[in-house]
Amino acid sequence: MRRIKLTIAYDGTNYRGWQIQQPTAAHPEGSVPTIQGALQRALGQLLPKEAVHGAAADTATAPDQVHEAVAPGVLPVVGASRTDSGVHALGNVACFDTESTIPAANFPKAINRYLPADIRVMQADEVSMDFHPRFVSHEKCYEYRIDHGRVANPLTRLYAYHYTYPLDLERIRAAARELVGVHDFTSFVNPDSQVFEHGGDAVREIYSIDILEEGTQLVIRIRGNGFLYHMIRIIVGTLLIIGNGRRAPEDIRTMLAAKDRTTAGPTVPAHGLCLCALNYDAAVTAEDVRDDGDTETLAQDAETV
């Protein structure tokens, strides 16, 4: 048995997030498009002898040996970051187990034959059987793009949030500095986050927040050891209201201390967010890494659209 690690890029516009949705009466199995679902179907077509079929789907296990929702004719995969509905990625990571002898370097071309044009496997590597994309050491890097032009650029409308209010970038940078480090980010997490239901906490570490200008776009790049449900989008919404003068940069300290979602800013739309990269550098220790803690249901996804 071999374990294959995939680096995946996708345009999330037409998908209800990464994770396969549990079927409901309104949305029967297979009717809700997800990145994981498309990838599992593609692998099932590429490796039909290893695909899960019929009753076997009820007992299928993914590489972490934990049951994942699968449909007949698919090969289960586990992803590193379970992105929300409408969120994009340049470097998400997933892995699957296989007995195939296909060289790892040949998997991208082979899998991409069965994927829609808005999802692509960019790279494949064979890894050790104890590699887990979600729990081994890594950091996540996200970017949120804001179109700050007077008129929205039609070519970036699916990838940047058009925001026309005046912004003071020095105020935004001052506020961002207050967020760097280890904090309890409860005020910056959607209260529906399942991490709270499972007895977890909102303590995470943000390594850096960079505020960049690219023409009429403002790019907010955030690196950290893990992010919770809507956390980045709430952080960006908070930085924007500080940037246009409705709150002060030092109010970040009060928000963090309050541990109350109502004290922070709004949740900005999903389409401006992109998962840029996952770093599996050994310099980041396993203790530093925090899982995002959330599975995404249709009800949760509906709030992000």
Residue ranges and their predicted role:
Residues 1-305:
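Structured-RNA-binding interfaces characteristic of tRNA pseudouridine synthases
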